[in-house]
Amino acid sequence: ISRWRGYHGSGLISGSLTGLAVFHNKFDLPLDRILHTVTPHYLRRPDKDMKEEQFTEYCVDSLKKMISDEGAETIAAFIGEPILGTGGIIPPPKGYWEAIQKVLEDNDIMFIADEVVTGFGRLGTMFGSEHYSLRPDIITIAKGLTSAYAPLSGSIFSNKVWKVLEQGTDELGPIGHGWTY
């Protein structure tokens, strides 16, 4: 599950996760197995009479319904930027991340924090996840890693994810993870 207006790249899977029509039009994206939930952009809320806390509840309820409709067991992960990069560097509404993280934990859904924009001190903490007290299973990193002087990216895994990767490596051999620029 990703979010509309979120940006995660322009390849087949990352473009599908990106919630922007310009990355989908004429490319048969997003892939069917990729879901998008509502954008946590308070100024673009569907009902202008909603207070910020009500909008947070609306976002959370939308995610809960999606998970219920699809079945939590069919959902591998939720990906989101701590602060929505596309559309103007938009912080989430009050209480959003705390509530979203609880929904993910309650449904045993992995949480991926896309820290390409918010990582490496841009919010006053090393990662945007720290700023919002998030506990992601995976963190994606890039631009700030080299101050954008060189094309370098990476992933940081929680111990829970690392143990699964380590076990898989023992059984299946090394896991190839890389990209050619």
Language-model-detected regions and their locations in the chain:
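Conserved N-terminal phosphate-binding loop of PLP-dependent enzymes in the Aspartate aminotransferase
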Residues: 1-181
